[in-house]
Each structure stands twice: as C-alpha cells, then as structure tokens.
C-alpha cells in the first residue's frame, strides 16, 4: 500500500462582487477655473482597508483621492471608494495580509481608475489617465515601516 503524501491545501480565491461604495466629485473653483489655462498639478492618494465579513469572506475597499490644482486654486477633488467582496481560503498571516492589501486592490484599481476618469470628464475637464500602481511595492513598504516602528518601540 503506497503512502499518501500530504499535499498543501490549495488556495481558494473568488471575486463575489465589485462595486462602488462611495463617490464624490467637487469643483469648488467653477466656473472661473474653466477660464484659466489648463496646466494642472495632479496628485493622487491611495488607501486600502479590509474587513472580515464571515469565515473566508472579506470586503476590501480601495480609496483613490485625486486632486488637481491650477496654481494655488483647486480645480477639482475626486474621491472614489471602489470595493469588492472576496472569498479567500487557505491563506494565513503575511500571505493573507498580502492578498487583502496588494492582490485585491490590484483587482479593484482598474475599476476605480475608470470611475475617476469618467467623473473628471463629466466635470468637463480633459480626460485623466491615472498611472498604474504597484500595490506589491506599497505593501512591502508598509511592512518595512511597521517593522521599523516596532523595532524602535522595543529598543
């Protein structure tokens, strides 16, 4: 009788739903901002949050806050919370953290980017194409920052 070798359990991953959780578009300088030469300084802030809904089911929310200024005047402020519900099984610790803070936001980003672009265009501004984001690098930076802070507290 051949011995059965224990095989690691296969990771389970499914996208249950992708949806817009919250949208905000503000154009405080209108209509005067439309008279100015369009040479904006655009910035984007990114935030991710996750919460466990039930066993192996998580909501991940990616928040993109995009601002454009012409000189000192705010042209627009656009905030999009793109969310998803994901089934994730057979991951623990840092692998689960990586999945929820890098892999899932990477799935959500194209949806959020399209929503931001659409809102900016509806505000009658030129189309805004946000550059891709390396969520793996952002996750690694957050891990290193946390380790550094813990080391400072323990010394």
From Swiss-Prot:
It is found in: Cytoplasm. GO terms for cellular component: cytoplasm. Keywords: Chaperone, Cytoplasm, Protein transport, Translocation, Transport. InterPro entries: SecB, SecB-like_sf. Pfam families: SecB. The keyword Flavoprotein does not apply. Gene3D superfamilies: SecB-like. GO terms for molecular function: unfolded protein binding. Its main location: cytoplasm. One of its GO terms (biological process) is protein transport. One of the proteins required for the normal export of preproteins out of the cell cytoplasm. It is a molecular chaperone that binds to a subset of precursor proteins, maintaining them in a translocation-competent state. It also specifically binds to its receptor SecA. Homotetramer, a dimer of dimers. One homotetramer interacts with 1 SecA dimer. HAMAP family: SecB. Belongs to the SecB family. This is Protein-export protein SecB. It comes from Psychromonas ingrahamii (strain DSM 17664 / CCUG 51855 / 37).
